[in-house]
Amino acid sequence: MSFHEVRLPARLAFGSSGGVERRTEVVTLASGYERRSSPWTQGRRRYLIGANLRSLDDMAALTAFFEARRGRLYGFRFRDFADFKSCAPSGTPEATDQVIGIGDGVRRTFELSKAYGEVLRPIRKPVEGSVMAAVNGLAVEAAVDVATGVVTLAAAPAKEAVVSAGFLFDTPVRFDADRIEASLESFDAGRMAAVPLIEIRV
């Protein structure tokens, strides 16, 4: 298994920077017009962590976490504090936040996702105990696989019924370097160079 179901400790993530990137291929024609296309259906997130760490204990904790992941070898969960809810960052998740499917009278399994305008982002790493589901706005019983983001309802929703969910989630990432660097500035403090993370598909 190339993914460890463990989250980077929050104290090591505070002060991180980053965001989503897209890959766009642009060809400029002889006429001056452009032809643009993208091989990616989903954006990919990148982050920098560790640059604000000064405590030797925190630096040691990040080093230990890095070693346990074998550098770039194993993925892990990362809490992006700017985007980790099914609702707005300042809100509280509700079961009607995100539409995750339409019932057909037979199907009971649905995959969590979050809408960004017309773009749907698959949510593969929901937080255990945070997922709520609803059918046509009414709360329903559901089981959740927190390793895949698959929701299984106790009963199949009727045809055309709207299935929705609310949740917290982590972003699956890996280290994007096989090396981290730190310097000792006093007996009990130091400085760590920023460590890159990159979102992975799971």
Whereabouts are the PLM-identified features?
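Short, conserved charged micro-motifs
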Residues: 56-62
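Exposed beta-strand and adjacent loop surfaces of beta-rich binding modules
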Residues: 46, 128-132, 160
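Short amphipathic beta-strand starts and helix->beta connectors
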Residues: 27-36, 136-138
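Polar/acidic, low-complexity leader/linker segments enriched in S/T/G and N/D
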Residues: 1-24
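Extended beta-strand solenoid/passenger and fiber regions
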Residues: 63-144, 168-202
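Oligomerization/assembly interface segments of phage tail-like spikes and tubes
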Residues: 25, 36-55, 182-202
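Small/polar beta-strand repeat architecture
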Residues: 155-174
